[in-house]
Amino acid sequence: MSRVGKLPITIPEGVTVGLNDLEVKISGPKGELSKIFKGNIAISLAENKLLVKPLAANKSARAMWGTARSIISNMVIGVKEGFKLKLEINGVGYRAMVKGKYLNLMLAKSHNTKIEIPSHIKIDVPKQNIIILEGTDKEKLGQFASIIIKQRPPEPYKGKGIKFDNQFIPRKEGKKN
């Protein structure tokens, strides 16, 4: 029995849900999201609550049960409130700026790195070393953040690189002479 999957998803005011077999369309004040689910699950809407149930008792159906419930819950939160991620850049001369539809990163390379900003993500750079990402889709927001972090991942010796705001980087000692 999935502890996550058996919980109903309450639909808040201002959010509408459309069901078409395994396709879920959710719209709210921040935008609209839709997703088609695969697997042995059934999604039903009753009394302003969404319920996800497995159709079989096998392992893959139970795994998809909790996963589908979490994804739908994140979709509801995304269209109602949205998601926000904060990235921090550490290092001498490392900085970020937004130019048009590109994020321009200066990360001590021989060239500046340009990353195209997806249409569903808003980026704010209040300081040169802080990037704030906002969007309705939690999965796509995390994927875009990982693309940015991949440009210069944090290293354990001096702590230079791009990391999530609350991420802890374990530090190592340098060479001993």
From Swiss-Prot:
The similarity annotation says: Belongs to the universal ribosomal protein uL6 family.
Subunit-level organization? Part of the 50S ribosomal subunit.
Annotated NCBIfam families: L6_bact
Establish whether keyword rRNA-binding is in the entry.
Answer: yes
- Which keywords does this chain's UniProt record carry? Ribonucleoprotein, Ribosomal protein, RNA-binding, rRNA-binding
Q: What InterPro entries would the database entry show?
A: Ribosomal_uL6-like, Ribosomal_uL6-like_a/b-dom_sf, Ribosomal_uL6_a/b-dom, Ribosomal_uL6_bac-type, Ribosomal_uL6_CS
UniProt cross-references to Pfam families, sorted A to Z: Ribosomal_L6
Q: Which GO terms describe its molecular function?
A: rRNA binding; structural constituent of ribosome
- State the organism of origin: Rickettsia akari (strain Hartford)
Q: Does the keyword Ribosomal protein apply?
A: yes
Protein's name according to its UniProt entry: Large ribosomal subunit protein uL6
Q: Name one GO biological process term.
A: cytoplasmic translation
GO CC, sorted alphabetically, is: ribonucleoprotein complex; ribosome
Taxonomy of origin reads:
Bacteria, Pseudomonadati, Pseudomonadota, Alphaproteobacteria, Rickettsiales
The protein's job, in short, is: This protein binds to the 23S rRNA, and is important in its secondary structure. It is located near the subunit interface in the base of the L7/L12 stalk, and near the tRNA binding site of the peptidyltransferase center.
